[in-house]
């Protein structure tokens, strides 16, 4: 398989999995077993494509918030998004400096996929018994910020899965409202994470040699696919539960745990 086709597939995979509650990190690690491992810079660029995708998909919502800060509800919402991001940034930096992160290898990812799928089924069942609410509380904002850190510590957890369901359990029980808030918090979080990673790479001597055609193709693929996925998901969860994603995670995690010993042998 050519490097260009491999880059295209990895870009599509990033766009497909970044915003679905199934773990983009886990899927990229799995794909790299067959498509080859790419540089950290390549992975940052395709995530940048996902960032652009969500900004485009939510552009109307972002514009409404930006131009409506004179309204109390909009100011309150933006402030809670900011607090959630700051919690992630501060706690995440402490965790990173302390070195608290599992290695990005297939076995912990497989367990995270499996356990995360079970967690999703249980969490949505419990949240389904709560009164339907779409108001973001301070408790939800802080918890979402912490949940993003947890997702960073345990590769394969999925940022969207951990944050959406903790928000639902703590009172933001309407699925679409929880996803909307989580995606809003995800925008500055992903920007900051990518910027920090680029800065660290620069300090370590630069970005190395890249095939820029591969990088460009992957970026565009991640952007287009991510845009479609965000639009589809926000429409889908208005009428459907997350069950299909939970079952998919359980099946994939179990399959990986069965495959790994055979592959090692």
Swiss-Prot record:
What's a Pfam family in this record?
A: BacA
Regarding the membrane, this protein is recorded as: Multi-pass membrane protein
What's a single GO CC term here? Answer: plasma membrane
Q: Which cysteines are joined by disulfide bonds?
A: none
- InterPro entries from the UniProt entry: UppP
Catalytic activity field: di-trans,octa-cis-undecaprenyl diphosphate + H2O = di-trans,octa-cis-undecaprenyl phosphate + phosphate + H(+)
One example of a Gene Ontology biological process annotation: regulation of cell shape
NCBIfam families assigned: PRK00281.1-4 (NF001390)
Q: What is this protein called?
A: Undecaprenyl-diphosphatase
Source organism of the structure: Xanthomonas oryzae pv. oryzae (strain KACC10331 / KXO85)
Q: Which gene encodes it?
A: uppP
